[in-house]
């Protein structure tokens, strides 16, 4: 676990980078099932202990050509009653690596703080130079870690081979090309941190807990903040109508232990719904859509499906609302690809996004784009997306860290629980970027666990 940030950066193993628990799952476990979180923590510690006991097996397999059984036996014997000794040695290597990087980083940031008070041009030039230095120091620190880690596993210091004079120009040539590339990257990163303004989308129709999710009452408040879209959740009712509801079971919001598909629309809209200290009635989709059109507020409508839905649910939905949705510029999304297919079959001009709660493999679909949980999103996914004409929305962006990551990866839209915070972040990034802060954020990528 301690080595993941370093190993992932050195090896760039695709599936190792996938070992990430989505943030929304972590938050849900912490909030609802803390005991499950405790069990996961214990299992992680157990896995870490096992990895310590077996870490000397790999060098035996690769360098000594021993069998798996012999290598495992060797590692277990070597670490017997000495686990803490090796843990502290590993920790010390990691600490030294980070200290090495931090000590080089401090004068860079200090000089940038002083230069940021001068003209924009001077500050930008030094910022690019400092960006190049940070990238070089980053790779120097990784090299230092790799040398120390391999020496630790093998018990031997790496031999220093004498430099050959004919390689001198090649080394400087490679270094020069790398610095030019880093400088170009730094210019783009510092001068245009937001190359195109992302759409800002209200999550479940609320912002900063200003009301009850998915209700007309909250829509009226949230629309005043001028989001580009308001994300909503729609489910079918027992009588084939449509209601505004996110949860599969409505007990948490209404106190009634039932699914939306168990009650008629009339029964649902008579229920009181409470959240964030606010109280109102459950909203029908008709009432919500009419209010949105009245306010000229565009919606991102998520269709939530269940086994209790009627077979022709989407056909009826599109026949009833399709024309209105298209005329008013609304968009759709769903976790169920059958919904995507049926929307496109009805009218391919209606934007519809496929929701991906986890980034595993890149899907090949006809969707307008993808709505991705941000914490597992990576450059590999984005690079493949650039080869298509599809868009990317990310959720849920509620911090400067998640905003920075989304901007860096070029997200087309950000779904957030705090519209004003994200709007402010976009304004600062476009109009008054702080080079010291941007350099610091770039440096902190080295510490990304």
Feature locations, PLM:
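C-terminal active-site rim and adjoining tail of enzyme catalytic domains
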Residues: 354-449
